[in-house]
Amino acid sequence: MGWEYGIKVADVKDIKVLMDRLAEALPRIDGYRMQRKKDGFILLQNNPDWPEALQVSVEEARNMEGLKDDEPYIYCLFHIGGEDAVKWRECMYRVLEEEECAAEWFEL
């Protein structure tokens, strides 16, 4: 599949703000475009066989260690690897470090 991560946010009210910050902070790289959705965003690439590069959305936990069932968290699925994905992941780490809300990055 790809790299899968979650972001647990201490206060559910902070999820939307954090999602917006993540979307705004990602470096713009030629060949990709962002599509905003109600529950997150997707970075699409110019590849008809595999258009999704990165998906970030709000999901509800089910049988996940460290989260209660139905607890919302931010789901991050990197459909691709390589240099571009590493740049996005590092940028997302920095956003979490800079944000005032309590958020924890974890690997799925």
Segment roles from a protein language model:
Residues I7-K8, M34, F41-L43, V56, ...:
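Hydrophobic transmembrane signal anchors and adjacent membrane-proximal interface regions, especially
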Residues M19-E24, R28, H79, E83-L108:
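Acidic, proline/glycine-rich low-complexity IDRs
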Residues M1-I15:
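Terminal, regulation- and interaction-focused segments at domain boundaries
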Residues K13-E83:
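Short, intrinsically disordered low-complexity segments
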